[in-house]
Structures are given as structure tokens and as C-alpha cells.
UniProtKB/Swiss-Prot annotation:
Upper taxonomic lineage: Bacteria, Bacillati, Bacillota, Clostridia, Peptostreptococcales
Keyword check for Metal-binding: yes
Catalytic activity line of the entry: 4-imidazolone-5-propanoate + H2O = N-formimidoyl-L-glutamate
SUPFAM superfamilies per record: Composite domain of metallo-dependent hydrolases, Metallo-dependent hydrolases
Keywords: Cytoplasm, Histidine metabolism, Hydrolase, Iron, Metal-binding, Zinc
Class of this enzyme: hydrolase
Functional pathway: Amino-acid degradation; L-histidine degradation into L-glutamate; N-formimidoyl-L-glutamate from L-histidine: step 3/3
HAMAP family for this protein: HutI (MF_00372)
Example GO biological process: L-histidine catabolic process to glutamate and formamide
Residues binding Zn(2+), per UniProt: 82, 84, 252, 327
CDD domains per record: Imidazolone-5PH
Protein name as catalogued: Imidazolonepropionase
Family affiliation: Belongs to the metallo-dependent hydrolases superfamily. HutI family.
Known role: Catalyzes the hydrolytic cleavage of the carbon-nitrogen bond in imidazolone-5-propanoate to yield N-formimidoyl-L-glutamate. It is the third step in the universal histidine degradation pathway.
Length: 422
């Protein structure tokens, strides 16, 4: 077989070989490293992975791209399973408020936070949203991310929610990264319904959701279950309607106060529960039993300066599968740098480098229901591959604040070279 791409003499390769995940407990440390390895690609698929001498049936031709992996670490394409990528405006004006100790929910109650981004997103044109989205996706790709979950939720009316989701669909067509769309009309209560949130929930269920489903614009539905946002009862209503309409479920819970959202995620069979900064051990056990993946967002804790992080170690001990994400958004976590999030996973949440890589590869893939296609370097999976300028996996979270990516292949095509999108 003539191969299109051969990466050879790889110092360390993280294959993530094994079950399609999600991995949990001690299995999160089993990344199945190969040293002095190689990987062969034909078209958009991985056709062989090994160490030492290449298999005899694989042929290199004059058109084969041969990449030297000496001194490099090679991993599956990274997955960022929780982002708010498409938005208008920015919120640097809130930095001074945060530094003066104004709580996040107080900023939201004053019409800031999510609501200020809603205002900007409603005003933004499709072209403006496309340009902003492409910039952020280029940044993510340069850091090694090849698959991104993207939520709506900065419209809070049918017209703008559809506009956001249409932009997400178009970005998915035009950008190398694969985008997984999530409808999040229940992201906040807009000012016009502040005194009657149940009416807004009716609009999400009866008007927004059918319009989204009719157009095939979303794969998932998400809700922000939090004090001052949506109650457990309201969240359940939205999720039940979304499930009945054929969408898969995810839910923002326990970011600031534990209302019972993690238990709701387990009850509803959500694929992910996200944030989980104040989740009880009892609810961790319920999530583990139900197989809910914990999408942890340490960058948000870092940026909000709350002094606490999700209890990743306890979750791992209880058997909750964990993924990590940037939570990229213009307010509580304005970063596209997944590598910094990996460092926080180690330093702030005491995860091992092996657990961190599991979290951003195969478990990230499971969090967006793509584990059969991506998340590991195995024969038959998509050729989404990252080549890091690092001698081993420990070096990447250890040496933080820079971009370690040398090259990225997406579907077998070189899309990043020398750390730059091409």
C-alpha cells in the first residue's frame, strides 16, 4: 500500500489505544505510549501505527510526505468540548470590576456578563461573526485542537440563536476544524423576561427549539442550571423537550452554587455535565453510575479568581470520566489556549499528564460523541494528528505559557506548520 503521509522516528507517541471511551479511574492513566514510533496515513485515515521498522506492505512514493518525528511528541488531534466560540464584542471592561471583587452573578444581574455579549451578538452581522469565529478557530487549531464543540446562547431570541447556529454550520464547512453544534437558548434570562423567566422558558421550548431542529442546526442542547439563571425544574423542562426532539444533552451545573444540576444530568442521561466546581461527592457518585462525563473548565476558575477548582482527583477516584476544555468565551474565560488548560489540569487540579492527555483526546471525543472516529491514533480513525516540539508528554504541561505545536494534520492534510496555520 502506497501511503500519503509517514511520520517516522517519533520520540514519544500517545496512541490512546484501547476502548473508545470515555476512560475513567485508573484507565485515565493508560495512554499507551510508543517510543521510536511511526504512523502511516492514506487519504484521511490512519492505516498503520507501530514502532521500529515499518511494515513491509507499506510503500513510500515520490509524493509521500515524510515527517521526521525525532525529538517530538505525537498525539491525536485535541478536542475542545465546551466553547462559546461565536459571539459579538468583547468584555475587557469587566476586568476592573472583577479586580474590585464584584461577583460574576452581580455583573450578570446588572445587565453585564452574558447579557452584554447578547446585546453585541444581536447587533453583529453574519460576516462579523464569521470573521471573529475564524480568528478564534485559527488560534485553537494552532494549539493543536482539531475538533471543537460550539454553543449558541448569545442570542436569547429565536432570530439570533438561529443566526449563531447558521454561522457555526458555515464555519464547519469553511474551516479545517470540525465543529459540533450545541443549541443553548437557555444560557441566561434576557432582560426583557427578567421578571417572568418561565415565559422565556416557554419560548425556548415552543419557538426556538422547533426552529433549530427543523433546520438541523444542532446536535446537542445545553442549559445553564445555576442560581439566578435557570432552576432545576426549568432546566429539566428544556432538556426533556430537547431529548424528545432528538437532541443529545449537556448541562452547565454547579459552577457557583450546587442546586442539584449534577443529579439532574445523571437523571436525564446527559452526555456531559460542565463546570462542576462545587459538586458534592454524593452527586459525583451519581454521575459515575450514570456514565456522565465531567467537562472541567479550570481556565474559568483561574480567570474569575474564585480560589477554587473542580475536584478532579475525587471525581477520578469515584469513577467519573473527565474531559478538559477552554470554555472559550468573551467573559469568564477568553482564551483559545488548550495547552494552558492542560497545565491548569495538572497544577490546579492535581491531574497527571497522562490523565490530562486522556481528557483532551479520547474523553474529549466521547464528550462530543465522536469517539468512534477521533481521539486516538488507531487504524481506521481519522488522521487528526498533532506533532509537538516536546520530547515527552510531561514537557507540554510543564513548560507553560508557550505554544509547543510544530505541525497539525487534519484528515491527513497538513494544516499547521511551524506553529502557524497554513
Amino acid at each position: 500500500m502506497m501511503v500519503d503521509v509517514l511520520i517516522k522516528d517519533i520520540s514519544q507517541m500517545v496512541t490512546m489505544k484501547g476502548s473508545n471511551g470515555p476512560r475513567r479511574g485508573k484507565d485515565m492513566r493508560e495512554v499507551h505510549l510508543i517510543e521510536d514510533g511511526w504512523i502511516a496515513i492514506k487519504g484521511d485515515k490512519i492505516v498503520a501505527v507501530g514502532s521500529g521498522l515499518m511494515e513491509e506492505n507499506l510503500k513510500i512514493g515520490k509524493n509521500t510526505m515524510v515527517i521526521d518525528g525525532k525529538g517530538k511528541t505525537v498525539t491525536p488531534g485535541l478536542v475542545d468540548p465546551h466553547t462559546h466560540l461565536v459571539h459579538g464584542g468583547s468584555r475587557e471592561n469587566e476586568l476592573a470590576l472583577k479586580l474590585n471583587g464584584v461577583p460574576y452573578l452581580d455583573i450578570l444581574a446588572q445587565g453585564g456578563g452574558i447579557l452584554s455579549t447578547v446585546k453585541a451578538t444581536r447587533k453583529a452581522t453574519v460576516e462579523e461573526l464569521m470573521q471573529q469565529g475564524k480568528r478564534s478557530l485559527d488560534q485553537m487549531l494552532s494549539f493543536g485542537v482539531t475538533t471543537v464543540e460550539v454553543k449558541s446562547g448569545y442570542g436569547l431570541n429565536t432570530e439570533t440563536e438561529l443566526k449563531q447556529l447558521e454561522v457555526i454550520r458555515q464555519l464547519n464547512k469553511e474551516h479545517p476544524c470540525d465543529l459540533v453544534p450545541t443549541f443553548m437558548g437557555a444560557h441566561a434570562i434576557p432582560m426583557e423576561y427578567k421578571e417572568d423567566p418561565d415565559v422565556f422558558v416557554d419560548i425556548v421550548i415552543d419557538e426556538m427549539l422547533p426552529a433549530v431542529v427543523e433546520r438541523g442546526l444542532a446536535e446537542f442542547c445545553d442549559v445553564f442550571c445555576e442560581k439566578g439563571v435557570f432552576t432545576v425544574a426549568q432546566s429539566r423542562r428544556v432538556l426533556e423537550a430537547a431529548r424528545e426532539a432528538g437532541l443529545k444533552l449537556r448541562i452547565h451545573v454547579d459552577e457557583i452554587e450546587a442546586l442539584g444540576g449534577a443529579e439532574l444530568a445523571a437523571e436525564m442521561g446527559a452526555i456531559t455535565a460542565e463546570h462542576l466546581m462545587v459538586t458534592s461527592e454524593e452527586d459525583m457518585k451519581k454521575m459515575a453510575k450514570a456514565g456522565v462525563i465531567a467537562a472541567l473548565l479550570p481556565g474559568t476558575s483561574f480567570n474569575l479568581m474564585v480560589g477554587k477548582y473542580a475536584q478532579a482527583r475525587k471525581m477520578i477516584d469515584y469513577g467519573v470520566p473527565i474531559t478538559l476544555s477552554t470554555d472559550y468565551n468573551p467573559g469568564s474565560c477568553p482564551t483559545e489556549n488548550i495547552q494552558f488548560i492542560m497545565t491548569l489540569g495538572c497544577l490546579a487540579m492535581k491531574m497527571t499528564p497522562e490523565e490530562v492527555f486522556t481528557a483532551v483526546t479520547i474523553n474529549g471525543a466521547a464528550a462530543v460523541d465522536r469517539q468512534g472516529d477521533i481521539g486516538s491514533l488507531e487504524v481506521g480513525k481519522k488522521a487528526d494528528v498533532v506533532i509537538f516540539n516536546a520530547p515527552n508528554i510531561n514537557y507540554i504541561p510543564y513548560h507553560f505559557g508557550i505554544n509547543h505545536v510544530d505541525k497539525v494534520l487534519k484528515n491527513g492534510k497538513l494544516v499547521v506548520d511551524k506553529g502557524r496555520v497554513i
